[in-house]
Amino acid sequence: MKSALKTFVPGALALLLLFPVAAQAKEVETKTKLANVVILATGGTIAGAGASAANSATYQAAKVGIEQLIAGVPELSQIANVRGEQVMQIASESINNENLLQLGRRVAELADSKDVDGIVITHGTDTLEETAYFLNLVEKTDKPIIVVGSMRPGTAMSADGMLNLYNAVAVAGSKDARGKGVLVTMNDEIQSGRDVSKMINIKTEAFKSPWGPLGMVVEGKSYWFRLPAKRHTMDSEFDIKTIKSLPDVEIAYGYGNVSDTAVKALAQAGAKAIIHAGTGNGSVSSKVVPALQELRKQGVQIIRSSHVNAGGFVLRNAEQPDDKYDWVVAHDLNPQKARILAMVALTKTQDSKELQRMFWEY
């Protein structure tokens, strides 16, 4: 009996010692199978904090760092190998062209890395749609790039940031998100970075596209219903690596009793192009038309867009004789997205016909 015990005890100890090794090996195998996703943090409401849980609309944005954001969603480790970088920490209404270029260059560096399968960018919602469209134009990669934010700070009751971030990482790590351009995941929907806009500022269901979402995320799985129709990323003629700076493009708003004061002031301040955010079909007041005609003769590009809330659709030579005036129409791009494309396009050409082609294709 003693002999049997002597044999059993060392054997049992050996098995017990093997259990941690086997568990570690399984953990390593699991991590190897998971996608490698980098989260670039820029600030915004998703990194915001309020004074109490009841503060869903009054809070301070850009307070929480990326490591704290990741730690707040421990389930991320089950769907991807995640690491974070704090690229900047600002409210998105303060993002400028230099910030766009800085972010775009870092995204390109990561996209070139064999160790990165997908990229998530946490962003304030005020200009999220602009950043998403900019990246959609200039990033030469088919790897998933997801821009995500939240409508409520993490300190609020029923905060939406945790699930939005989880969904963003899930989409960024999925192979079926490759080649679909830059995406935005908010409120369980997958939107095209080109199409999506913030439609309301106090609801979690805030981001909508005039042509509908590309898909949905349910319990971390992506379901797709349509593909982007316009050129983007790998098919784009623009490349962040060749863009040194962005020209000044400004927006002038159209409304009843408008004067030409704004457009003249913007041109005098150095605008290379003016997006006219017109009513309806990009309409321009008769008080403003002569000033825009004169500015075009001086070399300023004039681009007609519409500030219709649900999405404008500006037809060329309707409302205004664009061919005669040598103006450009923004197609279905809202004024803020038209500004993004105009800035990027002007790094390639000053020809209005080429600009119009780009507005049709992108």
Swiss-Prot record:
Transmembrane segments: none
Assigned EC number: 3.5.1.38
Signal peptide: 1-25
Chain sites annotated for binding substrate: 92, 125-126
Entries under Pfam families matching the protein: Asparaginase (PF00710), Asparaginase_C (PF17763)
Keywords, alphabetical: Hydrolase, Periplasm, Signal
Annotated catalytic residues: 45 (acyl-ester intermediate)
An example molecular function term from Gene Ontology annotations: glutamin-(asparagin-)ase activity
PROSITE patterns membership: ASN_GLN_ASE_1, ASN_GLN_ASE_2, ASN_GLN_ASE_3
PANTHER family in UniProt: 60 KDA LYSOPHOSPHOLIPASE, L-ASPARAGINASE
Similarity-based family: Belongs to the asparaginase 1 family.
NCBIfam families membership: asnASE_II
Entry protein name: Glutaminase-asparaginase
Species whose genome carries this gene: Pseudomonas fluorescens biotype A
